[in-house]
Amino acid sequence: MSTSVPTKNDVLVPETLLKKRKSQEKARAERQAEIEKKKAANKEKRAVIFKRAETYVKEYRDVEREKIRLQRAAKQDGSFHIPAEAKLIFLIRIKGINKIPPKPRKILQLLRLLQINNGVFVRVTKATAEMIKIVEPWVAYGYPNLKSVKELIYKRGYGKVNKQRVALTDNSIIEENLGKYGIICMEDLIHEIYTVGPNFKQASNFLWPFKLSNPTGGFRTRKFKHFIEGGDLGNREEHINALIRQMN
């Protein structure tokens, strides 16, 4: 009796194995389709982000040009150009917790200035102006320019995600937490803060208080005197930008 090895065609593939293969092929196709879909969405999103960034650059440039134009016009007329009141303040806590009365202590907590060298962006309102006046003996503050806002957020920016401090390494972190307010990337976040936009509160609350370094060269010898008396405390207006550079 002769025996022969069965050919490939003679061996029937079990139905369960066929179903498994079909299922795997379907899953593979679905995964690939999902990857392609994400690629297309990311490409579209990058284009949107790039377009927004271009728009912001033009907006910032136009505002600066208008300011220069008004200054020149005032100079020609022999008058003074009075700039618009600042809407944004950057506050830095530079004094510790010793001998703080309950009221300023509470306000420092509300402002999230819990440690020395913590910094936060604050919208200028009547209420915040009153609060700042009370905590002035513990803080340095002033009006940050665009360069300062950008450098702070890019270099020291952390977001509050599920009560955790998370580095802003990816635009997706911003989109997941602020996307519902139309803020989907770093440039959106910077724009919202710098222009004190309609969703400033959500944007500034998302940003974890900045942890700054001691200034290069140290604070002034009379650190706890007011800025106008040769110290570091209180309102230094545009001069806050120099301090930010030193501490960032």
Curated annotation (Swiss-Prot):
GO terms for molecular function: RNA binding; structural constituent of ribosome. It comes from the Eukaryota. One of its GO terms (cellular component) is cytosolic large ribosomal subunit. GO terms for biological process: maturation of LSU-rRNA from tricistronic rRNA transcript (SSU-rRNA, 5.8S rRNA, LSU-rRNA). Signal peptide: none annotated. InterPro entries: Ribo_uL30_ferredoxin-like_sf, Ribosomal_uL30, Ribosomal_uL30_euk, Ribosomal_uL30_euk_arc, Ribosomal_uL30_ferredoxin-like, Ribosomal_uL30_N_euk. It is found in: Cytoplasm. Its main location: cytoplasm. Gene3D superfamilies: Ribosomal protein L30, ferredoxin-like fold domain. The keyword Magnesium does not apply. Keywords: Cytoplasm, Ribonucleoprotein, Ribosomal protein. Residues 24-42 have a biased composition (Basic and acidic residues). The keyword Ribosomal protein applies. It holds the Pfam family Ribosomal_L30. Residues 22-42 are annotated as: Disordered. Component of the large ribosomal subunit (LSU). Mature N.crassa ribosomes consist of a small (40S) and a large (60S) subunit. The 40S small subunit contains 1 molecule of ribosomal RNA (18S rRNA) and at least 32 different proteins. The large 60S subunit contains 3 rRNA molecules (26S, 5.8S and 5S rRNA) and at least 42 different proteins. Belongs to the universal ribosomal protein uL30 family. NCBIfam families: uL30_euk. Component of the ribosome, a large ribonucleoprotein complex responsible for the synthesis of proteins in the cell. The small ribosomal subunit (SSU) binds messenger RNAs (mRNAs) and translates the encoded message by selecting cognate aminoacyl-transfer RNA (tRNA) molecules. The large subunit (LSU) contains the ribosomal catalytic site termed the peptidyl transferase center (PTC), which catalyzes the formation of peptide bonds, thereby polymerizing the amino acids delivered by tRNAs into a polypeptide chain. This is Large ribosomal subunit protein uL30. The gene is rpl-7.
